[in-house]
């Protein structure tokens, strides 16, 4: 795995974790931005940089997300639906996982073609 951080004047703003699946595929395992910096484009900037860095060696990047975050990833080019793992968050976590006000249940995978312009 690779871990990336976006800082602003020595303050950690966003962090991302990339898992190498095979010789041509990566998975964005997590990307998170500090609460007081959200909705200001930091995650978008970090993700764009990661895609740019990896496109020379890899063909596609996967992301598993919740329904609430799909619009963000589609705007970033993750436009191909791959699969849904039903009840992922219920089956794999003892405590309820929330995304804002929504309770997370399914893990939904999308992919981005890193070679596409």
Name each region found by the language model.
Residues 67-92:
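Conserved active-site alpha-helix within GNAT-family acetyltransferase domains
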Residues 5, 11-20, 25-32:
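Conserved beta-strand in the GNAT
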Residues 7-9, 112-113:
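Active-site beta-strand termini and strand-to-loop segments that position acidic
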Residues 37-49:
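Conserved acetyl-CoA pyrophosphate-binding loop and the N-cap/start of the following alpha-helix
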Residues 1-3, 103-110:
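Short hydrophobic/aromatic beta-strand or adjacent loop that forms the aromatic wall/cage
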Residues 91-99:
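Low-complexity, intrinsically disordered Gly/Pro/Thr-rich segments
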């Amino acid at each position: 795995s690779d871990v990336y951080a976006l800082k602003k004047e020595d303050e950690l703003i966003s962090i991302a974790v990339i898992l190498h699946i095979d010789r041509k595929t990566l998975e964005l395992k997590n990307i998170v931005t500090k609460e007081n910096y959200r909705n200001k484009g930091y995650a978008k900037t970090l993700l764009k940089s990661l895609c740019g860095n990896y496109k020379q060696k890899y063909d596609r990047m996967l992301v598993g997300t919740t329904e609430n975050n799909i619009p963000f990833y589609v705007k970033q080019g993750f436009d191909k639906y791959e699969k849904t793992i039903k009840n992922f968050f219920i089956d794999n976590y003892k405590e309820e996982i929330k995304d804002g006000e929504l309770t997370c249940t399914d893990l939904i995978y999308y992919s981005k073609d890193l070679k596409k312009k």
